[in-house]
């Protein structure tokens, strides 16, 4: 559980749930921890690995004070849509950090160019409770496929997935992360890879379920040896907290992000030019009262 004491009044310790090692959430969380603890010695943050869906559930249940999440999952949580078992009632938005891309990485010699081509192939993906794993099942369904139609399915970390691909134990690897992703960079350094293009009809399947989905380009050169531009399903990484959580701590975390772009650019290039206006984008999830105050104090219009 987390403490809800004011940062100026007494020491505070809390848990911040991030993502799997080998992805971008975990190191970004580590950078936030370092900056906040440096600037506020009375705050101690424990950064723990997590997953998009389970992080939101954990915040709602009071297990995490702050957590990383995906916009699409958090929107679904408000109504209890699958994979959530019931609606969340105490989850508020803190701000957007950067876009996430649902990447479908295939070995070049696997001949996987469409979802239908995945039949009979080996998959490595995230564990249950991860947004990327849920999206993988949805992706397969667009071609009438399930996990039972694949030769093998592994639920593991990004780094272990990359190792399985290197060793030829899997043909394709699905994940939701920023661009570029370290584990995919590692894979591309030793195996020729392709990214499967998402066509408009496949994207419509996702967009019809959640308006927060976007179709964004992954440019040629995003990874070593990757020489064509493709389209990927995209959404946003943001941070959430219980709606009644300590406002001083919320502002300390948001200040750490907004005032130290260089610290985050080295981890995720897309955070290099992050502005408070972008952080304050309305994604259909209520803002924490302290987050609204923070953005209003920083001059963001419409936050009064």
Placement of each model-derived feature along the sequence:
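Sec/Tat signal peptide C-region and signal peptidase I cleavage site
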Residues: 2-11
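Acidic, polar ligand-binding/catalytic clefts
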Residues: 64-98, 178-181
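Bilobed "Venus flytrap"/periplasmic-binding protein-like clamshell domains
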Residues: 13-39, 43, 100-167, 262, ...
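Extracytoplasmic
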Residues: 11, 40-42, 51-54, 61-64, ...
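An extracytoplasmic/periplasmic, membrane-proximal ligand-sensing/linker region
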Residues: 160, 166-168, 177-195, 207-208, ...
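Ligand-binding clefts/hinges and TM-proximal coupling segments of bilobed small-molecule sensing domains
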Residues: 122-138, 212-283
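Extracytoplasmic small-molecule ligand-binding "clamshell" domains
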Residues: 27-28, 35-60, 226-227
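Pocket-lining segment of extracytoplasmic ligand-binding domains
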Residues: 71-73, 80-82, 108-110, 146-245
């Amino acid at each position: 559980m987390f403490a809800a004491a004011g940062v100026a009044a007494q020491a505070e310790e809390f848990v911040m749930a991030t993502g799997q090692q080998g992805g971008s959430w975990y190191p970004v969380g580590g950078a936030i921890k370092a900056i906040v603890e440096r600037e506020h010695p009375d705050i101690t943050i424990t950064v723990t690995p997590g997953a998009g869906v389970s992080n939101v559930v954990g915040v709602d249940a009071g297990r995490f004070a702050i957590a990383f999440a995906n916009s699409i999952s958090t929107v679904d949580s408000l109504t209890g849509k699958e994979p959530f078992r019931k609606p969340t009632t105490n989850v508020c938005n803190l701000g957007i950090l950067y876009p996430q891309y649902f990447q479908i990485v295939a070995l070049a010699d696997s001949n996987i160019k469409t979802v239908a081509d995945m039949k009979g192939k080996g998959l490595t993906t995230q564990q249950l409770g991860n947004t990327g794993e849920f999206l993988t099942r949805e992706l397969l369904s667009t071609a009438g496929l399930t996990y039972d139609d694949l030769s093998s399915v592994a639920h593991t970390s990004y780094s272990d997935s990359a190792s399985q691909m290197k060793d030829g134990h899997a043909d394709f690897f699905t994940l939701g992360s920023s661009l570029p992703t370290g584990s995919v960079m590692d894979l591309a350094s030793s195996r020729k890879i392709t990214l499967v293009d998402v066509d408009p009809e496949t994207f419509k399947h996702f967009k019809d379920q959640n308006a927060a989905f976007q179709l964004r380009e992954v440019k040629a050169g995003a990874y070593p040896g990757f020489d064509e531009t493709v389209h990927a399903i995209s959404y946003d990484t943001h941070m959430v907290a219980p709606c009644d959580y300590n406002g001083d701590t919320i502002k300390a975390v948001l200040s750490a992000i907004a005032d130290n772009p260089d610290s985050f650019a080295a981890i995720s290039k897309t955070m290099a030019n992050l502005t408070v206006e972008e952080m304050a984008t309305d994604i259909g999830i209520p803002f924490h009262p302290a987050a609204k105050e923070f953005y209003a104090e920083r001059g963001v219009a419409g936050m009064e």
